[in-house]
Amino acid sequence: MSGKTKRLMVMAAGTGGHVFPGLAVAHHLMAQGWQVRWLGTADRMEASLVPQHGIEIDFIKISGLRGKGLMAQLTAPIRIYRAVRQAQKIMRDYQPNVVLGMGGYVSGPGGLAAWLCGVPVVLHEQNGIAGLTNRWLARIAKKVLQAFPGAFPNADVVGNPVRTDVLALPLPAVRLSGREGPIRVLVIGGSQGARILNQTLPLVAASLGEQITLWHQVGKGALPEVSQAYQQAGQAGHLVVEFIDDMAAAYAWADVVVCRSGALTVSEVAAAGLPAIFVPFQHKDRQQYWNALPLEKAGAAKIIEQPQFTATSVSSLLASWDRATLLSMAERARSVAIPDATERVAAEVVAASKSA
């Protein structure tokens, strides 16, 4: 890169849905010669994960208010003010050309601090419905981007940056054509409210028998209980694991996936080109429902709300899908994916830095 090295500050905290897309954009711009630092919180996943990617991280002290008591609500303005001041000092020391907000509690104080320091803010909303922080930050952002249509009325739809190994998977027609035998069902539980999946899928396995084979990620600490449930159902032959390290390999193996519909999961399922049964987490603003809806509308997935997610409903749905149907759904999933999301977000960061 000619001239002075451009500097980016990425704001992303709390969950993989915020942090992993931020890392994808960071690595893309670092490969172009950019210097990148991270703004996060010291007690969440980014604190250990981001340095593993060769990126220095700064911390501010901030947490969410949802579900907190009255005292936390009353002291919130003071804590937010302090977090903004912390972020301002970090911005002044680092002097970024642009700040990229990818979500999490850190984005509110960080985005305001950037604006107060005269640094352009590019905002990316991962979910199909915008959270409170991003709705507020959109008023001061230089550019607002969204992964799914509908979060903001006039924002560009750029998708969610996903891992390169998922993007590199063969297309559905190559991967799925000619497959025989039981339908391969990938079950992704683990983080947010996976108990319903862990309770229901052993019963589905018992109902469908040799029609399906499962690879089931159950999440931390749940392996003994779920393994026992499969054994009691007479279905001990399925692969039941606590965590899947290589999700690209799991997607490549699968014919269909059963999972929650967090923003990054939905984007990965589309990029992989997989049919899905989505079970949205029961959040009051129905964020995960809106994430999954574009794939259902495209004929690539079915949404089953948690109260209706029973062994009977899931078994009936899986039994109704033959391999030709699954291939058609897989191709529709891939058709609505945005495989160059990382490049699109990075391009907006570059554009914002030039107009600063």
Curated annotation (Swiss-Prot):
Against HAMAP family, the record matches this protein to: MurG
The record, for PANTHER family, names:
GLYCOSYLTRANSFERASE, UDP-N-ACETYLGLUCOSAMINE--N-ACETYLMURAMYL-(PENTAPEPTIDE) PYROPHOSPHORYL-UNDECAPRENOL N-ACETYLGLUCOSAMINE TRANSFERASE 1
User: Which Pfam families does the record associate with it?
Assistant: Glyco_tran_28_C (PF04101), Glyco_transf_28 (PF03033)
Q: Which domain of life is it from?
A: Bacteria
| Gene Ontology terms: biological process | carbohydrate metabolic process; cell division; cell wall organization; lipid glycosylation; peptidoglycan biosynthetic process; regulation of cell shape
Q: Which CDD domains match?
A: GT28_MurG
The similarity comment for this entry is: Belongs to the glycosyltransferase 28 family. MurG subfamily.
Q: Coding gene?
A: murG
Record bears the keyword Protein transport: no
Enzyme Commission number(s) of this protein: 2.4.1.227
Name of the featured protein: UDP-N-acetylglucosamine--N-acetylmuramyl-(pentapeptide) pyrophosphoryl-undecaprenol N-acetylglucosamine transferase
Pathway assigned in UniProt: Cell wall biogenesis; peptidoglycan biosynthesis
Catalytic reaction annotation: di-trans,octa-cis-undecaprenyl diphospho-N-acetyl-alpha-D-muramoyl-L-alanyl-D-glutamyl-meso-2,6-diaminopimeloyl-D-alanyl-D-alanine + UDP-N-acetyl-alpha-D-glucosamine = di-trans,octa-cis-undecaprenyl diphospho-[N-acetyl-alpha-D-glucosaminyl-(1->4)]-N-acetyl-alpha-D-muramoyl-L-alanyl-D-glutamyl-meso-2,6-diaminopimeloyl-D-alanyl-D-alanine + UDP + H(+)
